[in-house]
């Protein structure tokens, strides 16, 4: 059984991680454990590089907390220009898989608050009245009227980040081209 450490305690992220690992390896073969670790980036990462760094840092911290695990998973949401998205980073002892989620253009009413230094989740709570929205459907759930959620969008990106761990083509050694 694979011991998978999710570098988060956010229920929406843990559910996405659970769904992805279950899809790839089977529910009976995975045990998911969430741990609270720091991303090492601001609460609201800005830009792809800062956001991916946050996901990688989460994996690094989770590895320190649970070194005996088989997989470590970091998910970090961020904003780039006018869009929200997230980076997924999955590692085992010898491989790393990464993927970026789909992006959602945010309305100016939200972006204004972010430019003033507030977090997307806080702005969404302020505008919708939904407490702790980032642990639920998130901005994606609100703007798609529930057709998508943080969990569903992250699930898809996590499946892509898992590809190097199960697709045999990724294990084929590189052969030098013959002149």
UniProtKB/Swiss-Prot annotation:
Belongs to the YjjX NTPase family. Gene3D superfamilies: 3.90.950.10. Pfam families: NTPase_I-T. InterPro entries: ITPase-like_fam, Non_canon_purine_NTPase, NTPase/PRRC1, YjjX_NTPase. Binds 1 divalent metal cation per subunit; can use either Mg(2+) or Mn(2+). Phosphatase that hydrolyzes non-canonical purine nucleotides such as XTP and ITP to their respective diphosphate derivatives. Probably excludes non-canonical purines from DNA/RNA precursor pool, thus preventing their incorporation into DNA/RNA and avoiding chromosomal lesions. Keywords: Hydrolase, Magnesium, Manganese, Metal-binding, Nucleotide metabolism, Nucleotide-binding. Mg(2+) binds at residues 38, 68. Disulfide bonds: none annotated. Signal peptide: none annotated. Its EC number is 3.6.1.73. Its cofactor is Mg(2+); Mn(2+). It comes from Pectobacterium carotovorum subsp. carotovorum (strain PC1). One of its GO terms (molecular function) is ribonucleoside triphosphate phosphatase activity. This is Inosine/xanthosine triphosphatase. Homodimer.
């Amino acid at each position: 059984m694979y011991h998978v450490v999710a570098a988060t305690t956010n229920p929406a992220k843990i559910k996405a991680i659970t769904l992805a690992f279950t899809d790839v390896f089977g529910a009976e073969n995975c045990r998911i454990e969430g741990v609270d670790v720091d991303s090492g980036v601001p609460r609201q990462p800005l830009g792809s590089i800062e956001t991916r760094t946050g996901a990688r840092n989460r994996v690094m911290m989770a590895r320190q907390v649970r070194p005996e695990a088989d997989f470590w998973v970091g998910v970090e949401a961020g904003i780039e220009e006018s869009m929200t998205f997230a980076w997924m980073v999955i590692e085992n002892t010898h491989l790393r898989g990464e993927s970026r989620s789909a992006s959602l253009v945010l309305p100016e009413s939200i972006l204004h608050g972010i430019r003033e230094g507030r977090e997307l989740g806080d702005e969404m709570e302020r505008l919708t009245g939904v407490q702790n929205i980032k642990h639920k459907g998130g901005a994606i759930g609100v703007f798609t009227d529930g057709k998508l959620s943080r969990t569903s969008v992250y699930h898809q990106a996590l499946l892509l980040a898992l590809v190097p761990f199960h697709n045999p083509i990724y294990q084929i050694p590189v052969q030098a081209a013959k002149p």
